[in-house]
Amino acid sequence: MSSSIDLLKLIAEKGADSQSAQDIVDNQVAQQLSAQIEYAKRSKKINVRNKLSIEEADAFRDRYGGAFDLNLTQQYHAPHSLAGALRVAEHYDCLDSFPPEDPVIDFGGSWWHHFSRRDKRVHSCCPVLGVRDAARHEERMCRMRKILQESDDFDEVPNFCLNRAQDCDVQADWAICIHGGYDMGFQGLCDAMHSHGVRVLRGTVMFDGAMLFDREGFLPLLKCHWQRDGSGADEVIKFDFENESTLSYIHGWQDLGSFFTESVHCIDGTTYLLEREMLKCNIMTYKIIATNLRCPRETLRHCVWFEDISKYVGVSIPEDWSLNRWKCVRVAKTTVREVEEIAFRCFKESKEWTENMKAVASILSAKSSTVIINGQAIMAGERLDIEDYHLVAFALTLNLYQKYEKLTALRDGMEWKGWCHHFKTRFWWGGDSSRAKVGWLRTLASRFPLLRLDSYADSFKFLTRLSNVEEFEQDSVPISRLRTFWTEEDLFDRLEHEVQTAKTKRSKKKAKVPPAAEIPQEEFHDAPESSSPESVSDDVKPVTDVVPDAEVSVEVPTDPRGISRHGAMKEFVRYCKRLHNNSESNLRHLWDISGGRGSEIANKSIFETYHRIDDMVNVHLANGNWLYPKKYDYTVGYNEHGLGPKHADETYIVDKTCACSNLRDIAEASAKVSVPTCDISMVDGVAGCGKTTAIKDAFRMGEDLIVTANRKSAEDVRMALFPDTYNSKVALDVVRTADSAIMHGVPSCHRLLVDEAGLLHYGQLLVVAALSKCSQVLAFGDTEQISFKSRDAGFKLLHGNLQYDRRDVVHKTYRCPQDVIAAVNLLKRKCGNRDTKYQSWTSESKVSRSLTKRRITSGLQVTIDPNRTYLTMTQADKAALQTRAKDFPVSKDWIDGHIKTVHEAQGISVDNVTLVRLKSTKCDLFKHEEYCLVALTRHKKSFEYCFNGELAGDLIFNCVK
């Protein structure tokens, strides 16, 4: 299949990778590279030097790990460090939405942030609204003087003004507002956009849906308390960061609240629409779009959701002991229910109301202090505030009185008391028995609210159900208010003008040869406004960790297929670097918490827990001994000098990533390779179609080279090609793993054969193809089995799957028994896959029945048979089976070769398979089509599914009859 990639769209949305600028254009400055190639999010590297907790680092990676290359160095303590790190990333996230060469306005931002990165196109409106703003300008002047004295590259004046955004006359089509809207509000931002001629604005604010409901709350990730104070136009909201002495923030509630409650605003003939995009890390990203196009009137609706608010009941209690002012207190629904259930049974009307309230208060104290599970108090409940406890007990007592009175009235109303009473209750009151004892005055008061008789004990509502969502609806601006419009023809004129302008700019760039210049090596650091200059750093410069050799020149592809392949190869380089950095970061964290320093480790006991979970975690002592008996060989280790090879007299720590630490070498080698131009043909065959046999038949000695995804596949192919000399130098040279080929190089070949190509990253395959200088790639695999998976949940793969130019499909299997055909067809139907090649697959196997299943209660019911291969979906089940296998007469080599996860087993072919699930807890892999397909198609003769308990959505259970 030919590639059909839109080049302009690709550059705008994905782009190339400016992290390896030397690989694209040698000796080009980063700014020229960004302007010529792309201005994509993933081309930015952000160094965060703040010390973030594990939870904060995970949240930061989850929010921006796919958009930027994050380097968390954990160097400095800083006030509200996560908020500062997020603020830096938010700048680039918002700026990357706009054309890279157009001017941009920053409302309320820091001019230093853009000046230090040489981003001359951004104009900052930095008004002095108080002494804090004035002090910030002085601090920025200090930083500017420092950078001017340390570097000769800065000769531009910062692009900013001291005007309010509404009063500035600088014009631009785009704008950002990073936490600058608190004092402007939605309509204030619209006024600023109107004065600047801005069409699209993107910004961020701290967000908590409970602000619409409560008077105070807490943003857990930012560790920020907020509190609403005052009322009406004077109401403010205060933000205080927990356990920090930095200045707090106070803003008008009407301004901040407008981002939650309003959606549209009109100024003259322009309509401004607010859209809330994303809520992550307690920060909401939004955009405001201006339009002059004619549009019909519509109702705009949005909802603000409160997390877990439905678990509570609102209890009305008097505020400051006033009969006229009441406030709502949230009490856990389970607490209120249990208090009412117990107190209702013990309630006695003959007692004084204070005695009944004491009983309610006693039950309330017990139920709000503990949570009972299975008859035992095993966890603390949600204690009430000391100021609210007595009033909540009072309100619940009066609520019980109300219910008894209403039940009494209901029973009395059900008795026959004549036609007059019947007419009054059924027709006049509409069957509402609650009015029986309130009298005519209360009835009239309910119809005329001005009488204000709804705060008495017999009519007040003490309990209210809380909704977990606040709904807002607003009409778009009426047509009568729009005085000027662009017509549809005007819109098309704008489109044509943009295209012509782009063509003109391209022509000028082609006519002008950019001068050669060295990429600056300085790193410039930025900090949040309220922290020290060292606290946060973010670099936009290309990564200089991998510098190509001077003689290596990487050509920049210009065709759509080349651009796609270039992006895949750069993604593979970034992925390898990410995994290497993760390994180093994990080991650094372990070294720090264990008190490692020099040749001493202060707290060796911490390794006991880690070693019990993973026996590859160990400590090498300076005397040459190991803290635990050495079972594995390690190539590198970690200490205060970093990750790398160590000497016998050094103290260092290791884990499983130290056994074969080659990711950095793979990344460096891959970064030097140009994009290959060879064609890629895919042989897409069903499971057991004889792909290894096909490789053997297609292989031509002296012309072809074979590459596999892993060592086991390479050994199988060598055994098939060279059964007698599979360990010879010839066999080892022509059949290689992809990692080995990249690290050590490969001989040139005419054709590259790839086994289990789906397990390789697309960029990894392209790197091997480029190194081999082949003219054709013949890839063998199954596009419906397990594909390449990222080992970093925060790294989003855009080019992981293989892209081919031609595809040949094979429908015949020689391995799978006949009943597997039906089981896989059922699997595909349950997954809704109607276009699968397995819909028409056939089998040459003589085995008609092979699938069975058996219920077990523990791993002790699994008998280890040396003639079977045991598969699991999870590493935990695999470890449990390996422990179980030690009770049987099998060797360690047998355990390593015959107990695998399904992912590890892809590509193998054995006679008998047992798939084991030892837990009934949630496991999404049993719902994944590709994993279940691999599990069902590894055997030739028999397959047994041993499962412990029912698991919702278990495809294996449903497909094995």
UniProtKB/Swiss-Prot annotation:
Annotated segments matching region Membrane association: 392-409
Look up keyword Membrane and say if it applies. Answer: yes
Question: Its domain of life?
Answer: Viruses
In the record, what terms sit under GO molecular function?
Answer: ATP binding; helicase activity; hydrolase activity, acting on acid anhydrides; mRNA methyltransferase activity; RNA binding
Mode of membrane association = Peripheral membrane protein
Its keywords, alphabetically, are:
ATP-binding, Helicase, Host endoplasmic reticulum, Host membrane, Hydrolase, Membrane, Methyltransferase, Nucleotide-binding, Transferase
Residue ranges for the region (Disordered) are 503-541
Q: Which residue ranges does the record assign to the Alphavirus-like MT domain?
A: 71-260
Where it sits in the cell: the answer is: Host endoplasmic reticulum membrane
GO terms of biological process kind: methylation; mRNA modification; positive stranded viral RNA replication; RNA processing
Q: What's the reported outcome of changing residue 400 to A?
A: Reduces 1a membrane association
Q: Per the annotation, which location comes first and is thus the protein's main one? A: host cell
Determine if Lipoprotein is one of this entry's keywords: no
Concerning Gene3D superfamilies, the annotation shows:
P-loop containing nucleotide triphosphate hydrolases (3.40.50.300)
Which portions of the chain have biased composition (kind: Basic residues)?
Answer: 503-512
Q: (+)RNA virus helicase C-terminal domain location, by residue?
A: 811-961
Q: How does it assemble?
A: Interacts with RNA-directed RNA polymerase 2a.
Q: To which protein family does this belong? A: Belongs to the bromoviridae replication protein 1a family.
Protein name per Swiss-Prot or TrEMBL = Replication protein 1a
